[in-house]
A protein has these predicted regions:
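Short, solvent-exposed loop/turn and secondary-structure capping segments
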Residues: 60-63, 148-151, 203-204, 242-244
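...with weaker cross-activation on analogous glycine-rich loops/strands in unrelated enzymes
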Residues: 152-237
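Low-complexity, Gly/Ser/Thr/Pro-rich intrinsically disordered linker/tail segments
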Residues: 235-275
Length: 275
């Protein structure tokens, strides 16, 4: 525990130094592309973009290794809010709060009297991964019922639920799976990649292993066109980040580089057309 706290103190101090540097102005948000006839899609896009705004609009192209600037440590409260959405959340929140309190005590003891307060680096809360909790949170904020999109701390488990709904009732399923090379994502859809050592390359492969954990990542598509698929995801380099993926002339996401997790499914959001 003492070693962990020491590492946390070092990260907190390093984060403070990074935040003191000059930051380039954030890019403008994507222009909303969801029509009034698709209020459910619009609500999900709005929820994702609102969270992105809270984090300072970090934006990257493709698959960088680091962000241009570490997000503010005050975003810690946002991470806790995402965890509150999923069943596994209370235990994670309790551990985070205990660690946070211990770090704050250590920082208070290290700083001279009258020095500005230093908060623990946001990167400390990247584990356990909260990207699925983020997607669950924005779904809840958009008013998507839990029986339609079951909140989960693991992408693979809500992916299983969406695939099961599609398999049993394709006409009425709220999310329809598509092969990424066959379907151009639209705002309000989900685009998912498999981060496993031996990844899936098609959603049909997942049907053979329901309930088995796989490290995955899904983002909410917020804009498309112009040779890009723009999507917002959580815990991307420790933050809520808008990523711009290259797309072909038809708007379909191009395959990631060979050393990056492959896209294996795009879930078409049909919340506005199903009941």
């Amino acid at each position: 525990m003492r070693g962990w706290i020491g590492r946390g103190l070092a990260l907190a101090m390093a984060g403070a130094a990074l935040l003191s540097g000059c930051a380039s102005p954030p890019p403008p948000p994507p222009v909303p592309q969801v029509s009034a006839e698709a209020p459910q899609r619009a609500a999900l896009v709005r929820a994702a973009l609102e969270e992105w705004e809270r984090w300072g609009r970090p934006t990257v192209d493709g698959w960088p290794e680091v962000l241009p600037q570490e997000p503010a440590p005050e975003n810690y409260s946002n991470v806790l809010a995402y965890w509150e959405t999923v069943p596994e959340g209370p235990a994670v929140i309790q551990r985070h709060q205990q660690t946070h309190d211990a770090l704050m005590t250590g920082l208070m003891e290290m700083l001279p009297v009258g020095a500005p307060q230093v908060l623990p680096s946001i990167s400390l809360w990247s584990h356990p991964a909260w990207s699925a909790a983020f997607v669950s949170y924005v779904m809840q904020r958009a008013g998507v019922p839990g029986f339609v999109f079951p909140p989960s701390a693991a992408h693979s488990f809500y992916v299983d639920a969406l695939l099961a709904n599609w398999s049993s009732y394709p006409e009425g399923a709220a999310f329809r799976p598509h092969a990424p090379h066959e379907y151009a994502p639209r705002p309000g859809d989900l685009i998912c990649a498999d981060r496993s050592i031996s990844p899936l390359y098609g959603w049909e492969e997942r049907l053979a292993e329901p309930g088995q954990f796989r490290p995955m990542h899904c983002d909410v598509v917020v804009a498309s066109g112009g040779g890009l698929v723009q999507a917002v995801g959580g815990n991307v380099l420790g933050a809520v980040v808008l990523r711009r993926f290259p797309a072909d002339a038809a708007g379909r996401a191009l395959p990631p580089p060979w050393d990056k997790p492959p896209f294996f499914v795009v879930f078409e959001n049909r919340l506005d057309t199903t009941r």
